[in-house]
Swiss-Prot record:
The lineage of its organism: Bacteria, Bacillati, Actinomycetota, Actinomycetes, Mycobacteriales. Keywords: Toxin-antitoxin system. It comes from the Bacteria. This is Putative antitoxin VapB16. Putative antitoxin component of a possible type II toxin-antitoxin (TA) system. The cognate toxin is VapC16.
Length: 58
């Protein structure tokens, strides 16, 4: 399991991450899921643009 996924579970809870990130990743792919994750983080952190590390896709 990817570290970014574990970090998001710790921050938001597993149900939120599964609904917003993991389930869509199965349908649309990892890149799209990371984009959705960054949008979720932007909402949480007040509009800051956050970049996920390249290793997050592994």
């Amino acid at each position: 399991m990817a570290l970014w996924y574990q970090a998001m579970i710790a921050k938001f809870g597993e149900q939120v991450v599964d609904a917003k990130v993991w389930a869509p990743a199965k349908r649309v792919g990892v890149h799209e899921a990371k984009t959705r994750l960054s949008e979720l983080l932007r909402l949480v952190y007040g509009g800051q643009r956050l970049r996920l590390p390249a290793a997050a896709s592994r």
